[in-house]
């Protein structure tokens, strides 16, 4: 089995910007002086030797996540980069070590293992194993508990909080400067692209609200740790996500807690990696006893653990914020089902609200880098179509078609598979973020809404990455 997910490699997929072939991080290789020259042999498995009078195994070059985040040589995520701490192998190693510590009675070093599962991987795995989504969640929970999980959580509470924070942020920005477009922040592929390619020009437009993954990180490492009476560093937090970019997001310095001396999310695995782990064991989800997911946030759990947020597949930001802004800013009620108008392609759509003959709200959804690039060019030229808010996602069709979702198994076209996943999503119950659970988190943990604590824990900042000119960037 490969050291990392088989899909994590350079691709030439349409509408996907692959990383630069050159990494700008210089790596020093000690060379031996020779009058006759040396021969370097590279084996298929990556083992390579330098031979002259004998053989010398060369040092394996590893690029860490921090190198990748500080680099400006790539456009999107970690494709083609060896990510040593964000793989299924690293996860299984940690779980085995934890079980060994339990068996030896060394309780002081045992960690609490917490898994958080996003809705898109659940839908992908449900389709792969021909299960209902809630049923798949319970079987996956059973599988993860067998691996060593102490808690298995859904992202529902964080999805709700992200919408509440983002809508409030939009209303405040609109009142301060209605001409400044606000762009969503939950997609790390898009954020990475913005930081490295457009820098200080575009960063003021991006919402500061953290993604649901990172909000879950705060809740697990602080709120759950507090309830368990342990330090956040004693919790090993794993998330199951639909794309590899989430691995980079979890490794940002912004999401390292000095209070806990640990990252809010320790490890990210993806839908396809879960499938590979099951394939390695020659198992299916159905073979694991179902187990209820945990709900440690309030005394009374919700009716279900897997929820949809609006009708779009990437968190429902554009829809939810549009409805809230129309009501909050203009006292206008909108239909439950909004009708976004597709423009040049199905991955770019818009909706607007008119009042007294004037467009007062104009929202858009832009999925895929082709549409993102077009949007950026219009903003830079000052010829933007006047959008007040744009939900931006790097993947065509959004998170439901994330780059690490389970692949088609029968020669099925990706578009057809995506449509089937969308149908499963539409069958889920709709979450209303204004609920007793989020209110409890605000009052019991965040000292209320719009407080210094909520601002500190639920928001983040961005950093332009300076383009470096090195010899490795030169193309001969």
Swiss-Prot record:
Component of the cytosolic iron-sulfur (Fe/S) protein assembly machinery. Required for maturation of extramitochondrial Fe/S proteins. SUPFAM superfamilies: Fe-only hydrogenase. InterPro entries: Cytosolic_Fe-S_CAF, Fe_hydrogenase, Fe_hydrogenase_lsu_C, Fe_hydrogenase_ssu. The keyword Acyltransferase does not apply. It comes from Drosophila mojavensis. It comes from the Eukaryota. [4Fe-4S] cluster 1 binds at residues 23, 68, 71, 74. Keywords: 4Fe-4S, Iron, Iron-sulfur, Metal-binding. [4Fe-4S] cluster 2 binds at residues 187, 243, 395, 399. GO terms for molecular function: 4 iron, 4 sulfur cluster binding; metal ion binding. The keyword rRNA-binding does not apply. Gene3D superfamilies: 3.40.50.1780, Fe-only Hydrogenase (Larger Subunit), Chain L, domain 3 (3.40.950.10). GO terms for biological process: iron-sulfur cluster assembly. This is Probable cytosolic Fe-S cluster assembly factor GI11683. It holds the Pfam family Fe_hyd_SSU. Belongs to the NARF family.
């Amino acid at each position: 089995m490969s050291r990392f997910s088989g899909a994590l490699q350079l691709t030439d997929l349409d509408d996907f910007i692959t990383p630069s072939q050159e990494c700008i991080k210089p790596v020093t290789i000690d060379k031996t002086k020779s009058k006759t020259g040396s021969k370097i042999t590279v084996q298929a498995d990556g083992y390579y030797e330098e031979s002259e009078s004998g053989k010398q195994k060369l040092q394996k070059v590893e690029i860490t996540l921090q190198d990748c985040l500080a680099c400006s040589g790539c456009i999107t995520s970690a494709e083609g980069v060896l990510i040593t701490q964000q793989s299924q192998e690293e996860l299984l190693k940690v779980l085995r070590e934890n079980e060994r510590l339990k068996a030896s009675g060394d309780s002081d070093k045992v960690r609490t293992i917490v898994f958080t599962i996003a809705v898109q991987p659940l839908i992908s795995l449900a389709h792969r194993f021909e299960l209902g989504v809630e049923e798949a969640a319970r079987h996956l929970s059973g599988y993860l508990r067998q691996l060593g999980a102490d808690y298995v959580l859904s992202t529902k509470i964080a999805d709700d909080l992200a919408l509440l924070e983002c809508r409030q942020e939009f209303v405040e920005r609109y009142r301060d400067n209605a001409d400044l477009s606000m762009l969503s922040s939950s997609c790390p592929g898009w954020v990475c692209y913005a930081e490295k390619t457009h820098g200080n020009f575009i960063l003021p437009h991006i919402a500061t609200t953290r993604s649901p993954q990172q909000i879950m990180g705060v809740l697990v490492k602080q709120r759950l740790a507090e309830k368990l009476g342990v330090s956040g560093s004693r919790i090993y937090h794993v998330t199951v996500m639909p794309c590899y970019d989430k691995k980079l997001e979890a490794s940002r310095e912004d999401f390292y807690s000095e209070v806990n001396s640990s990252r809010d999310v320790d490890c990210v695995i993806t839908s396809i990696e879960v499938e590979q782990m099951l394939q390695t064991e020659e198992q299916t989800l159905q073979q694991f006893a179902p187990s209820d997911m945990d709900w440690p946030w309030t005394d009374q759990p919700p009716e279900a653990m897997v929820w949809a947020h609006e009708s779009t597949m990437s968190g429902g930001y554009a829809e939810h914020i549009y409805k809230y802004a129309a009501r909050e800013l203009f006292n206008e009620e909108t239909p439950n089902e909004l009708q976004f108008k597709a423009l040049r392609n199905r991955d770019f759509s818009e909706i607007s609200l008119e009042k007294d003959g004037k467009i007062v709200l104009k929202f858009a959804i832009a999925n895929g880098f082709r549409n993102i690039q077009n949007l950026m060019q219009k903003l830079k030229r000052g010829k933007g179509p006047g959008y007040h808010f744009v939900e931006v996602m790097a993947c065509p069709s959004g998170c439901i078609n994330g780059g690490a979702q389970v692949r088609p198994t029968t020669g099925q076209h990706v578009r057809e598979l995506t449509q089937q996943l969308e149908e499963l999503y539409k069958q889920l119950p709709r979450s209303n973020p204004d609920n007793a659970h989020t209110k409890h988190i605000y009052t019991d943990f965040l000292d209320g809404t719009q407080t210094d604590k909520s601002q500190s824990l639920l928001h983040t900042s961005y950093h332009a990455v300076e383009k470096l000119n090195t010899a490795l960037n030169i193309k001969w």
